[in-house]
Swiss-Prot record:
Compositional bias per record (Acidic residues), positions renumbered to this chain: 528-556
PPR repeat residue intervals: 138-172, 173-207, 208-242, 246-280, 281-312, 313-347, 348-382, 383-417, 418-452, 453-487
Pfam hit, one: PPR_3
Record has Mitochondrion as a keyword: no
Protein name as it appears in the record: Pentatricopeptide repeat-containing protein At3g59040
Start-end of Basic and acidic residues biased regions: 557-566
Record family assignment: Belongs to the PPR family. P subfamily.
Secretion signal, residue range per the UniProt entry: none
Lineage: Eukaryota, Viridiplantae, Streptophyta, Embryophyta, Tracheophyta
Length: 583
């Protein structure tokens, strides 16, 4: 039976879901919008958008007195934010002039910092107001103070405020108990938080929807998944439940199953929302997309969200861009970013860094440069992660001269390289077999007070073994233990792969503790890979039919060469609970 020969096109085609969605939009909106991929070529990559340009806002005031008050308040807010402390600034404003410190100004400041979730400033102002004769500190103020301590995880402060309320003859209510419970949860005392919750269930006050949201969040972050599941199941039982679970509770359960690695249950909870009459939102879909590793699956969820007439936000776009970037589908990643800009969604640091990473992974330096410059143009100034990702673009392009120049620029621009920055440069010199330069960077890192991690030491061991001899690799293997970084399985695999004789293999077996046939197989497989670039070419190829989310591959060489995202290399990769769930 003859076999069909399939030729893969030189330019990769967007995923079926994304391209079909774009085509459907084009049919509906004839002449309004053409497919993003082709428009990128016509307009130029990341062309400026009007909505990103700085515009001067016209302000309207009631009268001259209102203008004075507004500007005074803004000045006060800016001064508090710049100093990081509110009380000294408020004291100064109180003593300046005859006007003193108006009550409305203080109240507005409190409300604004509460909206900004700057609970440290809220608690500082309220603690100060407790002892001011001109301010009538009421029960509402106490409740706001205990809420602030709850958000900060300051259970000592929350307990103290609750004690004061009790002495005043005030009966603790659902707000104060919930705040105390949250303070325990955020303070790492999950059992104490659970005890408060159980007491509320048994003897009152009756837990509110917010109470249930917070206890679910506490259980999930404390890895008490069984307890969270039991609470949620109780809420689903109409006979036992005092209230129905709301959208945020469903979001938290989706996040919990993601965290537990139970994707099937997460999808089941997602699907059950419609039947229970709970509306799905952008956050719901973001929660579901966040744990998918295949760009095809992420794209399907994204398409489903749009079919449901739910508008994606910057997190939605960032998750889809990240999925395409990981799959080395840079054109699709760029297309989605352009779509985001066309939709008038303002990109964040995270979104730009994810797009930058999509090009950096494949060593596309010029495209990465364009993204890097676009950040500044759009008044989103690159941070250290942006610089480190740009550095990795040079490294992945094997342009070590460019990498060295850019590394110097990082310091010139006022940033101090961290362990990931140094590790990226070390990786580059290791790939280039330039051991001397690699060691220079390593020594600079040590002198700057940064301790090497497992990945860096494994990289140096691998390069030393390949470029020098097996004895040098042995020395670095032993160095790991002396540095307090015990060799992991990947380091052991690399050492075994560097053994070129039977004696060296036996010595490696003795050190690693691997004495079975696996050690011999590893040595044969990795020992035959003399051409490193060949290894990289193989690891970077992917079939259209393959699942792109194979991040758990235990290939030692791949780890050493940083082909997979390292922990901390892009801190924006995994989105945190509060951003997804909104608690």
């Amino acid at each position: 039976m003859s076999q069909a020969v399939i030729f893969k096109p030189f330019v990769s085609v967007p995923s079926s879901n994304h391209s079909q969605r774009k085509l459907q939009n084009n049919i509906i909106n004839v002449g309004v919008k053409i497919q993003n991929r082709f428009r990128v070529v016509c307009m130029g990559m990341l062309a400026p958008r009007k909505f990103l340009q700085k515009r001067r806002k016209m302000e309207v005031f009631k009268d001259a007195a209102d203008e004075t008050d507004q500007k005074r308040w803004r000045g006060l807010m800016l001064e508090i934010e710049s100093t990081g402390s509110a009380v000294p600034v408020l004291r100064q404003y109180k003593t300046d002039g005859d006007q003193g410190l108006p009550r409305d100004l203080v109240l507005g400041t409190l409300v604004r910092f509460k909206q900004l979730k700057k609970w440290n400033l809220v608690s500082e102002i309220l603690e100060w107001l407790r002892y001011q004769n001109w301010w009538n500190f009421s029960e509402i103020d106490f409740l706001m103070l205990i809420t602030a301590y709850g958000k900060l995880g300051n259970f000592n402060g929350a307990e103290r405020v609750l004690s004061v309320l009790s002495k005043m003859g005030s009966t603790p209510n659902v707000i104060s108990y919930t705040a105390l419970m949250e303070s325990y949860g955020r303070g790492g005392k999950c059992n104490n938080a659970e005890a408060i919750f159980r007491r509320m269930q048994s003897s009152g006050p009756e837990p509110s929807a917010i109470t249930y949201q917070i206890i679910l969040k506490t259980f999930v972050e404390g890895d008490k998944f069984k307890e969270a599941e039991e609470v949620f199941e109780t809420l689903l039982d109409e006979k036992k439940s005092p209230l129905k679970p709301d959208q945020k509770m469903y979001h938290m359960m989706i996040y919990m199953y993601k965290k537990a690695g139970n994707y099937e249950k997460a999808r089941k909870v997602f699907s059950s929302m419609v039947g229970k009459g709970v509306p799905q939102s952008t956050v719901t879909y973001n929660s579901l997309m966040s744990f998918e590793t295949s760009y095809k699956e992420v794209s399907k969820i994204y398409d489903q969200m749009q079919r449901s007439d739910i508008q994606p936000d910057v997190v939605s776009y960032a998750l889809l861009i990240k999925a395409y970037g990981r799959a080395r589908r840079e054109e699709e990643a760029l297309s989605v970013f352009e779509e985001m800009l066309d939709a008038g969604v303002r990109p964040t640091h995270k979104a730009y860094n994810i797009l930058l990473d999509a090009f950096a992974i494949s060593g596309m330096v010029e495209q990465a440069k364009t993204v890097f410059k676009s950040m500044r143009r759009d008044r989103i100034f690159p941070d250290l992660w942006s610089y480190t990702t740009m550095l990795s673009a040079y490294v992945n392009a094997s342009d070590m001269e460019g990498a060295e120049k850019f590394f110097k620029r990082i310091k010139v621009d006022g940033f101090e390289p961290n362990i990931v920055t140094y590790g990226t440069l070390i990786k580059g010199y290791a790939k280039a077999n330039d051991v001397e330069k690699m060691m220079e960077v390593y020594e600079k890192m040590r002198l700057s007070g940064i301790k090497a991690n497992q990945t860096i030491l494994t990289t140096i061991m691998d390069a030393s073994g390949r470029c020098k001899n097996f004895g040098s690799a042995l020395g670095w293997y032993k160095e790991m233990e002396s540095c307090g970084v015990p060799p992991d399985q990947k380091a052991k695999n690399v050492l075994l792969s560097l053994a070129s004789t039977q004696d060296e293999l036996e010595e490696a077996k003795e050190l690693t503790g691997i004495r079975n046939e696996t050690a011999t197989i590893i040595a044969r497989v990795y020992g035959s890979d003399d051409d490193e670039e060949g290894v990289e070419d193989i690891s970077s190829e992917s079939s259209d039919d393959e699942d792109e989310g194979d991040d758990d591959d235990d290939d030692a060489r791949e780890t050493v060469l940083y082909d997979k995202p390292q922990e901390g290399s892009l801190g924006y990769g995994s989105l945190q609970t509060e951003e997804l769930v909104g608690l």
